[in-house]
Amino acid sequence: MVEPLLAGIVLGLVPVTLAGLFVAAWQQYKRGEEVG
């Protein structure tokens, strides 16, 4: 019964983690663009 829960957690966390990394990279890019 633990495996479906674990799979749900992983499937929930992976898109959130990717979205967080994408947003951080985009903010850094925009900040660099403003400075340049």
From Swiss-Prot:
Q: What does this protein do?
A: Component of the cytochrome b6-f complex, which mediates electron transfer between photosystem II (PSII) and photosystem I (PSI), cyclic electron flow around PSI, and state transitions. PetG is required for either the stability or assembly of the cytochrome b6-f complex.
InterPro entries the UniProt entry points to:
Cyt_6/f_cplx_su5, Cyt_6/f_cplx_su5_sf
What is this protein's record name?
Answer: Cytochrome b6-f complex subunit 5
Q: Where does the sequence pass through the membrane?
A: 5-25
Family membership noted in the UniProt record: Belongs to the PetG family.
Write down the species.
Acaryochloris marina (strain MBIC 11017)
Reply yes or no: does the keyword Lyase apply: no
The protein's location, in the record's own words, is: Cellular thylakoid membrane
Q: What is the membrane topology listed in the Swiss-Prot or TrEMBL record?
A: Single-pass membrane protein
- UniProtKB keywords: Electron transport, Membrane, Photosynthesis, Thylakoid, Transmembrane, Transmembrane helix, Transport
Major place of residence: membrane
> Molecular function (GO) terms listed?
electron transporter, transferring electrons within cytochrome b6/f complex of photosystem II activity
Gene Ontology annotations for the cellular component aspect, listed alphabetically:
cytochrome b6f complex; plasma membrane-derived thylakoid membrane
Q: Set out the biological process GO terms recorded for this chain's protein.
A: cytochrome complex assembly; photosynthesis
Known partners and oligomeric status: The 4 large subunits of the cytochrome b6-f complex are cytochrome b6, subunit IV (17 kDa polypeptide, PetD), cytochrome f and the Rieske protein, while the 4 small subunits are PetG, PetL, PetM and PetN. The complex functions as a dimer.
